[in-house]
């Protein structure tokens, strides 16, 4: 009795001393509230035997006027809390053993079947935006063990930024196994609580990688790695020993060393950057990701436009209490000092080539381990940055690894989250200029981030992150390959279905990114100005064009979830001018916008960010452009002819099964907007050539015209050369396209991009419209010549003459 009195008085004294220091916020999981706690027969479960956590809980319950943890359960002498205890080394058994959770066995033995356990988590220092002190950052929450001194500093520095989270109640009667005794049931419930607290902490902080040395060692000694070493050594002991050393070296090179003090220091610098150089980062649809984060391993797959994409997503996830992802990065960044900082921020360094089978096995096993532990991963599916502003085709490497890892694991939930990251002005604008002007692309360089420093002091406007609809990997594979079992001994093999599934998932990811695009002020300005045939508009006409494109977006059946960040035409123009992307000219009393060559090149980047939204509208208009009158059925037929290639070119969402309905909807919108007119007989015609509507009609047609012309260049070259090597075909097509750029004045360098020709040739081969013989020569199938006449509907005679002259 005296001992109990002493403990109670000590607890009261500690509570009195800590009360002025501790300030908390409360988080309730869905379905939990203070009213529910009041009404139920409640017992709190806390994750550690911590007096400070218990004091904080006592203060919180007093403020909410609900059951206190030290109050008694009805009709008993038991406190309303249980806590898990850290394992200890047993001298008797000579091993580390779990300790019984405080009070739990006694609670289980109660006759009251209505007692519920409410797991309660504590997060000290979860507001990095409010942390100005280096000490606050160093003593904030992490997975590493906490000494009494560090715990004291944690309370001093983070007592006023504590988050207490109440999880869903657990009915003891439902958790108990009636066939087991009290002790076994206590162990069972303790295991369940440990797993719950671990998942919750992992969702906030990321996986526990506080023992990196152990992780590196276990990765290098993984079963599959051992098998690969055995295969490569072929029984030679010396080779086997050398390969083991290499495996350890590779594992050490690959593994991140996620360090939360480093993360918080980086976050602090990012906060300054986003608030000083940009007007902050604006978010959409993050709540959906929060809901699924605790029960799923999340793979974030954002588009890649800028070097700062890396810090943008990690910053936002951390700021919103989500796990910091592990990010595969090129090992060219693994330099002294910088490499350690990046590794501490979650970087997984990887080589550009996976030709080394031992290295490939180790890297794959690491990705598999991350997924099995519920880690978040972030990578850019396009590979490198898009200098044109268009979405690039996905690279198969990491996507394939994610699929193989998931297929070989049981009871793991994986969600792939496409993300659009957009900027009103990218930091690399000037450094991209040469490539946007049509010069060949330079490779990635370590100095690239330093080259953008000259733009660092400029005002950069707003940044946007829009989270797309998550792709459930189990559902995707079930639909795609109809089977999910991949045996352990086949992990290093690639099943027949993998390539198709990888391609399909890659396409779904890029389409998911495109469907989540943030339509920025600069993108709307750029597409409105650059699609005009003269590329010169006065302010009033430019406003009218912007409003037209806004209306088309709002009426789109496919892209109805894109983010319109600004819908005021005047503000859109003023913002673009304010960002110094273009200067206006005063001609008489009119303000004219006519970009210079450099301005056109930069603006084309922003135009390309949203071009895909208008492709269906544009193709419908293009089918009418060079004919006097056309039937509805003929429009559908012509659009269907070219749309499969446009779909691949722009990573479009429209499916073949819904295309007819979407064309009908697009026609309805275009007719309502006055860009297409109906005759008395029900046929379709373009507007009168002397009207503003005709200018808008032509501007909209201009969006898809370069792509259709590029398709025709390839087909016509194949018709002129019955058997030709792929590289020679690309060379001839690029040469023709460059000449046409000069003749027709195309300002878009992607018109003659070799990669675009590559994509079209791939699609022709896939659809068996082009055949490849034993000597790798390409030959056009006969069916392609039948569509030649149809393709001519999309061009004027002048273009056809130019093509004939060049072949």
Which stretches of residues belong to each language-model region?
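Membrane-interfacial terminal anchoring regions of lipid-handling membrane enzymes
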Residues: 1-807
